Amino acid sequence: MENLDALVAQALEAVQHSEDVNALEQLRVHYLGKKGELTQLMQTLGKLSAEERPKAGALINTAKNSVQEALNTRKADLESAALTAKLAAERIDVTLPGRGQASGGLHPVTRTLERVEQFFTRIGYSVAEGPEVEDDYHNFEALNIPGHHPARAMHDTFYFNANMLLRTHTSPVQVRTMESSQPPIRIVCPGRVYRCDSDITHSPMFHQVEGLLIDEGISFADLKGTIEEFLRVFFEKPLGVRFRPSFFPFTEPSAEVDMQCVICGGHGCRVCKHTGWLEVMGCGMVHPNVLGMSGIDPEKYQGFAFGMGVERLAMLRYGVNDLRLFFDNDLRFLAQFR
């Protein structure tokens, strides 16, 4: 008991000079733990007389409380200092210029799709959609495509089984609309389509927009005027347009639409293969067989249909020479179209 004051003084000095919370914990264990120096003094009380024991016990408890209070005070000081240092280190200098958030932009294919849809919705068309996984009937048979047609071959179409496939065009949306609606019908059908093809101008997945108009008294002149006006508005300048006779099973007569090359103005360049013309879409008057199979009287109603590749239009509008660039997710390329 003689060295109690010295032991307390030693403990208080050690606490005062502690630099972190871990050191404080070690001091607490050293002095106040189960085998701590102050705790061990309590075991010496048995050697004292009954008269001395209460007074000695009170002194030891006072000493322990003094050390514990010093520990608590020092711990609070250290934690406060640590918090202050952390706040100072993390302080934001509001006078510094901000780091601007990079803004995104619509993909060029999305921009092109929206541009096409906006034109046709302004002249009374509605947007129709359908499943990308189609059955053979809606993708081929209902469109007057016989079983021996090359489009049904495995090298052109992704088949799941003999009856289910990934649609090769958005024409099935037209069929489903004709089956569920009566004329007049005015729709455009945007969406993803799939074909077994991949090179600088083809992709196994690409976007297509097809259009359909069915009503009484519709002629090829209506089709011609619609397409010419669309191309003029889409490319924002008057362009020469020509219609070449062609063949599609679902239209009769059918035509391929060429427009004056937007790169060289029709003078001839590498893009148009020095012809001055670029093919942009196929079109024609809806075949009577297609109307009849969809429950529409071909004697009363006529209609026209057209289809165009969205990536093809985007390539021509933005001067891109490789279709695959649209799907490479290269931000350096995509940032040009913000």
From Swiss-Prot:
GO molecular-function terms, A-Z: ATP binding; magnesium ion binding; phenylalanine-tRNA ligase activity; tRNA binding
EC number: 6.1.1.20
Keyword list, A-Z: Aminoacyl-tRNA synthetase, ATP-binding, Cytoplasm, Ligase, Magnesium, Metal-binding, Nucleotide-binding, Protein biosynthesis
GO biological-process terms attached to the record: phenylalanyl-tRNA aminoacylation
Annotated residues for binding of Mg(2+): E252
Catalysed reactions, as listed in the record: tRNA(Phe) + L-phenylalanine + ATP = L-phenylalanyl-tRNA(Phe) + AMP + diphosphate + H(+)
GO cellular component, one term: cytoplasm
Pfam family, one: Phe_tRNA-synt_N
Cofactor binding note of this UniProt entry: Binds 2 magnesium ions per tetramer.
Localization per record: Cytoplasm
Required cofactor(s): Mg(2+)
NCBIfam families: pheS (TIGR00468)
Family as reported in the entry's similarity comment: Belongs to the class-II aminoacyl-tRNA synthetase family. Phe-tRNA synthetase alpha subunit type 1 subfamily.
Subunit structure as annotated in this protein's UniProt entry: Tetramer of two alpha and two beta subunits.
Protein name: Phenylalanine--tRNA ligase alpha subunit
